[in-house]
């Protein structure tokens, strides 16, 4: 950091590999009886009395299957409105605001393993995180994203914004030549009519539509940090239609591979190193 910054405060947080988290949740669900269908999309859903008739398509073979269900949970993320309107053919006054978050990756800018949060003149904050051993991850932005069909890409404007933001704090002056790669994602935030993408709520909103028969639960918003609480809230909504659901249980249950004492991570690392000596220290 620049020498003019002499004071800071420190707190602890968590990080997660998002794709691995999704896979582990799918494995856990499968072990508990769920059927996981990858590379499959829902092409239509229609009400038939107190049931849904759902048509799916295998994206590799184009084979179609038909299923019946008492209820649909629409956790489509950025595509939640496409499921509501395009797949289920339902009109909805609720909507999501698609907000793009872009990141830049540079070579490692400092030796320690701490993260930084920086505050800018516009009132926003960005982070700087040691990333994949050899790099530093800097982000993120808040930019309205036009459509879920449009691939999210870090724009030159977003890249320059993050560089200027970081240059207010680091000794080293970064330029576009220092950016090794960029990536972007889209947040499906509940559209609360906020004046800017930054001001849009990060809370999730759950809405059940049962007009005309079988219910559908639509999930607007949500994030990794609170995904299990969101799921519990969703089950409370579902419980109005299925009163014999079990009590909440996920708070004290690990995902596959996590069933060991946190205090024993060091010993686990030693055992793995001994069993698989070809693995890199990293």
Positions of predicted regions on the chain:
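Short beta-strand segments that buttress and anchor functional surface loops
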Residues: 10-11, 54-58
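Rossmann-like flavin
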Residues: 1-33
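A conserved short coil-to-beta-strand element within the FAD-binding core of flavoproteins
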Residues: 38-53
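General small-molecule cofactor/ligand-binding pocket signal
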Residues: 35-37, 180
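Core beta-strand elements of the Rossmann-like FAD/NAD(P) dinucleotide-binding domain
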Residues: 60-71, 75
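C-terminal catalytic lobe of FAD-dependent flavoproteins
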Residues: 18-21, 28, 87-138, 143-282
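Short acidic, glycine-rich loop/turn motifs
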Residues: 56-62, 108, 120
């Amino acid at each position: 950091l620049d020498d003019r910054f002499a004071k800071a405060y420190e707190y602890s947080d968590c990080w997660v590999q998002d794709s691995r988290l999704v896979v582990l949740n799918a494995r856990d669900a499968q072990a508990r009886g769920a059927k996981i269908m990858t590379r499959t999309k829902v092409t239509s859903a229609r009400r038939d009395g107190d049931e849904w008739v759902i048509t799916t398509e295998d994206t590799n073979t184009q084979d179609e299957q038909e299923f019946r269900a008492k209820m649909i949970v629409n956790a489509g993320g950025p595509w939640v409105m496409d499921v509501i309107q395009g797949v289920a053919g339902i009109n909805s006054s609720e909507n999501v605001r698609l907000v793009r978050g872009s990141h830049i990756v540079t070579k490692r800018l400092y030796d320690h393993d701490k993260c930084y949060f920086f505050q800018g003149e516009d009132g926003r904050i960005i982070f700087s995180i040691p990333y994949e051993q050899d790099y530093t991850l800097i982000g993120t932005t808040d930019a309205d994203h036009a459509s879920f069909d449009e691939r999210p890409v870090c724009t030159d404007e977003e890249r320059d914004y993050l560089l200027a933001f970081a240059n207010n704090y680091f000794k080293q002056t970064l330029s576009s030549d220092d950016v090794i790669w960029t990536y972007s994602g889209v947040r499906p935030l509940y559209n609360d009519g906020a004046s800017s993408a930054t001001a849009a709520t990060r809370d999730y909103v759950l809405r059940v539509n049962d007009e005309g028969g079988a219910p559908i639960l639509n999930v607007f918003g949500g994030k990794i940090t609170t995904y299990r609480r969101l799921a519990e809230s969703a089950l409370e909504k579902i419980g109005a239609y299925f009163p014999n659901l079990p009590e909440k249980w996920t708070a004290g249950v690990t995902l596959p591979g996590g069933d060991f004492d946190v205090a024993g991570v060091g010993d686990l690392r030693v055992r793995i190193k001994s069993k698989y000596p070809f693995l890199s220290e990293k």
